[in-house]
C-alpha cells in the first residue's frame, strides 16, 4: 500500500511513497557506531507535505532535484520532533511519471511530526530492528537496513 507523506509516523517499516525531490545533497561519508557509511539527504514531498529523506549506501546521491520517484520498502525514524524517511540496501527507488504530480511550488511546507514522547535528539527506535533466527539468537539491522 502506498502512503502519503502527511500520514507518515515514526517507526514505520516497508513504507512505499511516490514523491517529488525538492532538494538533494551530494553523497558524503559519516562515522557511525557501525563504521564509516555513505549517505546523502533530500527533502521530498507530495500533495500532503514534505519530509527529510536520508539515503544510505548505494542510494546516496542517486536522486536529483525535480525528479518524481517511487520509493519502496523504506522506513521512518524520529529526530528532533520530525519524522524522517530512510532508504537503505533493501529499498528500491525508481523514477516515476510526472503526469498529474504536483510541481515543487504546489507541495505544502508542512512536515509530519513525531508524538511528544518521541521528540528526543537521537535516532528513534524502529522496533523492527530485532530479528530472531532459528536458534533464537538476536540479529540486529544497521542504518542501511542490513542484518549484522
Swiss-Prot record:
<keyword id="KW-0238">DNA-binding</keyword>
<feature type="DNA-binding region" description="OB">
    <location>
        <begin position="19"/>
        <end position="88"/>
    </location>
</feature>
<dbReference type="Pfam" id="PF21473">
    <property type="entry name" value="Ssb-like_OB"/>
</dbReference>
<keyword id="KW-0158">Chromosome</keyword>
<feature type="compositionally biased region" description="Polar residues">
    <location>
        <begin position="103"/>
        <end position="116"/>
    </location>
</feature>
<dbReference type="GO" id="GO:0005694">
    <property type="term" value="C:chromosome"/>
</dbReference>
<dbReference type="GO" id="GO:0003677">
    <property type="term" value="F:DNA binding"/>
</dbReference>
<comment type="function">
    <text>Binds to ssDNA, binds approximately 5 nucleotides per monomer, binding may be slightly cooperative. Inhibits the endonuclease activity of XPF. Stimulates reverse gyrase from S.shibatae strain B12 (rgy).</text>
</comment>
<comment type="subunit">
    <text>Monomer in solution, may bind ssDNA as an array of monomers.</text>
</comment>
<dbReference type="GO" id="GO:0005737">
    <property type="term" value="C:cytoplasm"/>
</dbReference>
<protein>
    <recommendedName>
        <fullName>Single-stranded DNA binding protein Ssb</fullName>
    </recommendedName>
</protein>
<dbReference type="GO" id="GO:0010212">
    <property type="term" value="P:response to ionizing radiation"/>
</dbReference>
<feature type="region of interest" description="Disordered">
    <location>
        <begin position="90"/>
        <end position="148"/>
    </location>
</feature>
<feature type="compositionally biased region" description="Basic residues">
    <location>
        <begin position="128"/>
        <end position="137"/>
    </location>
</feature>
<dbReference type="InterPro" id="IPR012340">
    <property type="entry name" value="NA-bd_OB-fold"/>
</dbReference>
<dbReference type="GO" id="GO:0000724">
    <property type="term" value="P:double-strand break repair via homologous recombination"/>
</dbReference>
<dbReference type="InterPro" id="IPR051231">
    <property type="entry name" value="SOSS-B"/>
</dbReference>
<keyword id="KW-0963">Cytoplasm</keyword>
<dbReference type="InterPro" id="IPR048970">
    <property type="entry name" value="Ssb-like_OB"/>
</dbReference>
Amino acid at each position: 500500500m502506498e502512503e502519503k507523506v502527511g500520514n507518515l509516523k515514526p517507526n514505520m517499516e516497508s513504507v512505499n511513497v511516490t514523491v517529488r525531490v525538492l532538494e538533494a545533497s551530494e553523497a558524503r561519508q559519516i562515522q557511525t557506531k557501525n563504521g564509516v557509511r555513505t549517505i546523502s539527504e533530500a527533502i521530498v514531498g507530495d500533495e500532503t507535505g514534505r519530509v527529510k529523506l536520508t539515503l544510505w549506501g548505494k542510494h546516496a546521491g542517486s536522486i536529483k532535484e525535480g525528479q518524481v520517484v517511487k520509493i519502496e520498502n523504506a522506513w521512518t525514524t524520529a529526530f528532533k520532533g520530525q519524522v524522517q524517511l530512510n532508504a537503505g540496501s533493501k529499498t528500491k527507488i525508481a523514477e516515476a511519471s510526472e503526469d498529474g504530480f504536483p510541481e515543487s511550488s504546489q507541495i505544502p511546507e508542512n512536515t509530519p511530526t513525531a508524538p511528544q514522547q518521541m521528540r528526543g535528539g537521537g535516532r528513534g527506535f524502529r522496533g523492527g530492528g530485532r530479528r530472531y533466527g532459528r536458534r533464537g539468537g538476536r540479529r540486529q539491522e544497521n542504518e542501511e537496513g542490513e542484518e549484522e
